Amino acid sequence: MTLNQILKFKRKKSVKKKKTPALLSSPQKKGICIKVYTTTPKKPNSALRKVCRVKLSNKNEITAYIPGEGHNLQEHSNVLVRGGRVKDLPGVKYHIIRNVYDLSGVINRKTSRSKYGKKK
């Protein structure tokens, strides 16, 4: 900006874009599964990643990742969603929390148990 522009107008404040807009500043939100399916990751990686479409309690519809090995999610299952993107899946900015509501924890998990809802 030139000096004349600064005298005439205020400087514009830069607005930070939220990384998880669908959660509306909440740490987690409850939702209902609409569709459970697998998808393939971006270029250097190869797998079948488990994801699901979730309708949140605030009527937003998002795509969320199901972490860990194996799951028991079906259509109309209740889930708890947190923020956190999956780097190699474009458009997936949310994770489902294991062992809350209808999603069970990972069976036979020994390490990092708290992240996958496995009791001791």
From Swiss-Prot:
Q: Name one GO molecular function term.
A: rRNA binding
Share an example GO biological-process annotation for this protein: translation
User: Sorted alphabetically, which keywords does the UniProt record give?
Assistant: Methylation, Ribonucleoprotein, Ribosomal protein, RNA-binding, rRNA-binding, tRNA-binding
Q: Would you tell me the Gene Ontology cellular component terms? A: small ribosomal subunit
Q: What domain of life? A: Bacteria
Q: Name one Pfam family in it.
A: Ribosom_S12_S23
Q: Which of the residues bear the PTM 3-methylthioaspartic acid? A: D88
Q: Does the keyword Secreted apply?
A: no
| Subunit relationships | Part of the 30S ribosomal subunit. Contacts proteins S8 and S17. May interact with IF1 in the 30S initiation complex.
- Described function: With S4 and S5 plays an important role in translational accuracy. Interacts with and stabilizes bases of the 16S rRNA that are involved in tRNA selection in the A site and with the mRNA backbone. Located at the interface of the 30S and 50S subunits, it traverses the body of the 30S subunit contacting proteins on the other side and probably holding the rRNA structure together. The combined cluster of proteins S8, S12 and S17 appears to hold together the shoulder and platform of the 30S subunit.
Q: Which family does it belong to?
A: Belongs to the universal ribosomal protein uS12 family.
This chain belongs to the protein called: Small ribosomal subunit protein uS12
* Organism name: Carsonella ruddii (strain PV)
